[in-house]
């Protein structure tokens, strides 16, 4: 499984940037996506995929320790949907 450091190393290799500069670039991309999503905007990267915020409806759940029915509030969650090019590359 690749992690953030692996991604930074790949960016550094592909762009001939230092790992420090690559880390700054990767962090800036992640922070920018986070800011757009927090503002309620969708991030569309053609060929790669879409990041968006989805709303989860309020629902009833169950406490696994007591079996008691509990109410789970509505919430917003980040979501990613892969684009066609990414799906094809993974096949």
UniProtKB/Swiss-Prot annotation:
InterPro entries (UniProt xref): Hist_DNA-bd, Histone-like_DNA-bd_CS, IHF-like_DNA-bd_dom_sf
Record bears the keyword Iron-sulfur: no
Single GO cellular component term: cytosol
GO biological process: chromosome condensation
UniProt superkingdom: Bacteria
Pfam families documented for this protein: Bac_DNA_binding
The keyword DNA-binding is annotated on this UniProt entry: yes
Keywords in alphabetical order: DNA condensation, DNA-binding
One GO molecular-function entry: structural constituent of chromatin
Family matches, as PROSITE patterns: HISTONE_LIKE
Similarity annotation: Belongs to the bacterial histone-like protein family.
Functional description taken from the UniProt entry: Histone-like DNA-binding protein which is capable of wrapping DNA to stabilize it, and thus to prevent its denaturation under extreme environmental conditions.
Assembly information from the UniProt record: Homodimer.
Full protein name: DNA-binding protein HU
